[in-house]
Amino acid sequence: MDSERERLERIAGNSLYAAGVNTDTVRYSFRIFARYLRGESILELGPAEGVMTELLAGTGKALTVVEGSRAFCDAIAARLPSVRVVNALFEDFAPAERFDNIVLGHVLEHVEDPAAIVAHAAAWLTPQGRILAAVPNSRSLHRQAAVIMKLLPAEDALNEMDVHHGHRRVFDPESFRQCFLAAGLAIEIFGGYWLKPLSNRQIEATWTPQMLEAFMQLGERYPDIAGEIYVVAALPR
């Protein structure tokens, strides 16, 4: 586990989730998650720089975050004193309370066993609680184009940015949904956002905010080929 903590600190030292288009992506995912939040409590797993955390804190619900990087934890605690910050690996977290909402934004592509993490999280839900999760989609238009141009060997191959952020895999819609089904959860909603035809670098160089917003919304119409996919899941009724 020490090696995993060291790995997380290394990634945290050069993270780009709060930079450029990545920030817009996280903010749009919050807009989607906000539609489905319920109850009075939220647990966020893997907040990184805390872009999502700041938005979740603004909902007024009691917010706990669990993050394996001490550097990220210290930064969030200093910026958002109302948030309960826990420095722990997900596997070691053992809360006494249960949560109405558990948010995993860009988390499951990082962990060794995503289905096991989802199963852990399911045990921390209130009876009416929900897990809200989002990940990059291997079937995104920009990945399909990269394969055709021979820039990637396969749609689910790790690209330069995946490696930079310590991703262990790139999900497709089927493998993403399977994480929740394997954990015994019921998938209430599957969707996507961010119809992404180009790389972040190309988009940041030429696109206007209006273009970004339009293509974020278009991804909701075409989830199977959107840049990001999401699931809202709950305990079986």
Q: Over which residues does each language-model region extend?
A:
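Conserved N-terminal segment of class I S-adenosyl-L-methionine
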Residues: 1-97, 101-105, 118, 192-195, ...
